[in-house]
Amino acid sequence: MSDPSGYHDRVNPDLLWRIPATARTVLEVGCGSGALGQAFKARQPAVTWVGIEAESSAAARAIGRLDHVLGGDVEDPALALPRLPPLDCLIYGDVLEHLRDPWACLQRQATWLADDGLLLACIPNVQHWSVLQQLLQGRWPRQDEGLFDRTHLRWFTRQSIIELVAGCGLVLHELQPRIFRPEQAAAFVQQLEPALAGLGLDRQELLDGVSPLQYVVRAGRRPAPPLQLDALSLRPQVGMVDVRISQPLRALASRPGVNARVSAGSLALLPAEPLTPRLLIWQRPALTMDPETLQRLRLLLRNGYVMVCEYDDDPAHWPAIAANGHLTFRGVHAVQVSTEPLAEVIRPHNAELAVFGNTIESLPPPRPPLLPGEPLRLFFGALNREADWAPWIDTLNAAFAAAPDRWAVEVVHDRGFHDALVLPRRTFTPTCDYATYRQVMARCDIAFLPLGDTRFNRMKSDLKAIEAAAHGLAIVASPTVYGDSLQEGVTGRLFSNADQLRQVLEKWRQAPEQVRAYGARGRAWVARERLTAQQVPQREAWYRSLWERRDELTRQLLQRVPQLQNPA
């Protein structure tokens, strides 16, 4: 195959997010330079990833990214694989069309799958409007890549893909079209419309067939039990929606049979029949005893939903919750929270409760060594934290004044903290989206995480420490919250007084190599314990258990809130 710039180093996101987050053994046929495997390893470092690649220069680059890289002909039955357990995932990303006999090859290699293993493929659609347009004009271009790639040997449509999967003895879980430039497909069908009746073609069926450039296929040895996870989230805020809702559900949706939808506004509910297993995960619902709220809850019950409240802050901070009889927790089937202290506060109102600590979806690349003489960049990013940082601002400024050329500070959100700094090198970023917040953090070397010892703060999670550690920052933090997760002197430094904070900053300034050492140990901690993929089995098991116990949970719910039994 020809190698246009970057051809072998692309990551197909529609494949990446469908690799089961729990996969431990993956074989990728046509791995290119290993970009897909490298991206997945950032989410699941424990995976063993084997790549097969015929193009020697791409395979050479993949060796540094993957666990095993094989050359040779993937269609050769004698191709020797390393000793592996049954595969959790077998991937063909735009490969089957290049094989001489993809039917025989796939049928043989599908036997390598574990009982719950997954076949994942991306296959070009020869029914695409651009192909039909060329054929109608009597042309078949030969190109370096794309639908007319000169190395394609076989061609597939939606129907022939279905037949390919069935011929391997696999059960089709998903056939997802990849559609680009839908307006061009619609224009093509519009041009053909006068002839459709005579050809016996339905306009919508034709449009559905000619729009996809490719299809993404998921299939397995056995049917996947369905589970629909719908979520009503808050409006986007820095980290809150991503970490608590979007990222965990995206990881769960990588599991066969699990489908997820997230909305910050309205959500079209599934109809009551057929009764597909379904949960609604509702982030911080403000449930009151007014008729409108009760009617919404009745509607969810009538449509067969198991309702889960997602909560991650001290409810006492919002008096309306108690004023409404804690309906936020009592008016749902179950509650999920981020910390055990928060669980202890909420559990008296609803005993069906799970604790899912905050996690990081994907590990950023390791940090490069600090350059000699380079200033240390300290990160602070928070809202409404003046009471937490004010006791330490004089200590920070004194440390900076001792060697102002050795320090720089990046501040996100908190203008007051930025303005209180006495340091030439300081940068302020206003309230921003989560991606920007993480980008600013990634530029830094040290994370400053002060938290005063208050009830409200004790209910908070250690998310900021996880984020900073994932980026390889050295962490200096208050013992409130962070003392329960950081290992003092190993994954971070804890301070309870000004002298301790001063000593940490001075030592790191004098020995900046320790900054990277703390960062590396913190990153290893996140990789071991705090990645989103590691929570998937626990979350899926609990959600499926809630559905299986829905009748009993609904009975308990109606006992807690008998008003929900009344008609609208």
What are these model-derived regions, one by one?
Residues L363, E513-E552:
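A charged, aromatic-enriched C-terminal amphipathic alpha-helix characteristic of glycosyltransferases
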Residues S233-R255, S362-L363, L371-A442:
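Conserved catalytic-core segment of nucleotide-activated headgroup transferases in glycan assembly
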Residues P223-M289:
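N-terminal pre-catalytic "stem/leader" segment of glycosyltransferase-like enzymes
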Residues R261-V345:
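Extended catalytic core of nucleotide-activated donor transferases of GT-like folds
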Residues L486-D499, K507-P512:
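Conserved acidic donor-binding segment of nucleotide-sugar-dependent glycosyltransferases
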Residues H317-W318, A387, Y434-V440, A447-A470, ...:
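Nucleotide-sugar-dependent
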Residues D9-R10, A35, R100-P223:
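S-adenosyl-L-methionine-dependent methyltransferase catalytic module, highlighting the catalytic core
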Residues M1-P85, C89, W103-L106, Q137, ...:
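Conserved N-terminal segment of class I S-adenosyl-L-methionine
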